[in-house]
Regions:
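Non-catalytic interface/targeting segments
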Residues: 1-54, 61, 86, 90-131
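Mid-chain, well-packed structural core segment of small domains
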Residues: 58-91
Length: 131
């Protein structure tokens, strides 16, 4: 799966989704993860709505997007493109997030991750027996 990280340096998630100048892109599976590059956001004049839509289009093909903050309209535009937005609220090293994701993928992924990856979430409970 492809993951985008809002980052000023490619080392940590440290930018707001709508204010970052670049997103660092990683490809990963259960065992490996590699940075495959970055995409830069072109500045310019225009409506905020247009800028959000341009960012969402730029990240098509990603499964997840990490940022420190993201507004509701921006998150909705990502979700409409089947991209799950995730917030860190504090600066977090990208490698730490990758390792957490690997752990989740090798275990029982939480429902939001299973859905984002197109997997059917496994049951986490046993149905009650009928009396």
């Amino acid at each position: 799966m492809k993951i985008a990280f809002a980052s000023s340096d490619g080392l940590a998630v440290n930018r707001h989704f709508g204010l970052t100048e670049s997103y660092y892109l990683w490809e990963m599976d259960r065992n490996t993860a590699i940075c495959v590059g970055s995409v830069s956001v072109e500045g310019g004049e225009g409506e905020m709505e247009d800028k959000i839509l341009a960012r969402a289009r730029m990240l098509e093909g990603c499964t997840l997007v990490y940022s420190m903050q993201i507004g509701g309209p921006a998150a909705a535009k990502l979700v409409a493109r089947h991209i799950q937005p995730l917030k860190t609220t504090t600066e977090v090293p990208i490698r730490d997030l990758i390792e957490k994701l690997k752990g989740a993928l090798n275990g029982r992924p939480p429902p939001w991750l299973a859905k984002a990856m197109g997997l059917s979430p496994e049951r986490t409970f046993e149905p009650a027996e009928e009396e």
